[in-house]
Amino acid sequence: DLFIRGFTEDGEVIGQRTDPEANMWLNPQSWSVISGLANEAQADLALQNVYDKLNTEYGAILMDPPYHAHAFDGALAVIYNAGTKENAGIFSQSQGWIILAEALRGHGDRAFNYFIENAPAAQNNRAEIRRLEPYCYGQFTEGKHSPNFGRSHVHWLTGTASTVMVGCVEGILGMRPDFYGLKIAPS
């Protein structure tokens, strides 16, 4: 029901459910589906856990709970306040991957919901919170653990446009290239 984040050089597991902080990570769940590593039951459970534990009205946060005191050696996320950047912020580029993962599992409505939650044009009614141009993605949006939840930062410094495009075109619209040509399978 949960894919770990990785391992430290000393073999410590990062992102296991018994960790007091950062025990649930977004990217391993998304990529378990995209890579085909997860079987159908594992994929659906991993995606449901993301939706239940990491999703917010602005998109899915990178991990939860944020680091405060317990971080593995070399964890740079701990230098950021809770809810910002790599410390449980909402990284825009990762939204494209969760969109694609949901769509690949046939969850088109949920994939579209993730798209809308983080799409710049859908934020115009919250401009005083977002504080970023309405036509570009920010690198990250402050997550639910931040007092500035919903504020976006670092415009134009992100690969979000391409990952979201892949998530929407190959995922939601279902137009995927394969060895034999173009496969059309909308979610």
Feature annotation, model-predicted:
Residues 1-77, 116, 120-149:
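Catalytic cores of carbohydrate-active enzymes
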Residues 21-36, 43, 47, 88-103, ...:
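Well-ordered alpha-helical segments within folded domains of soluble proteins
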Residues 52-57, 68, 79-87, 97-187:
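Non-catalytic C-terminal accessory modules of carbohydrate-active enzymes
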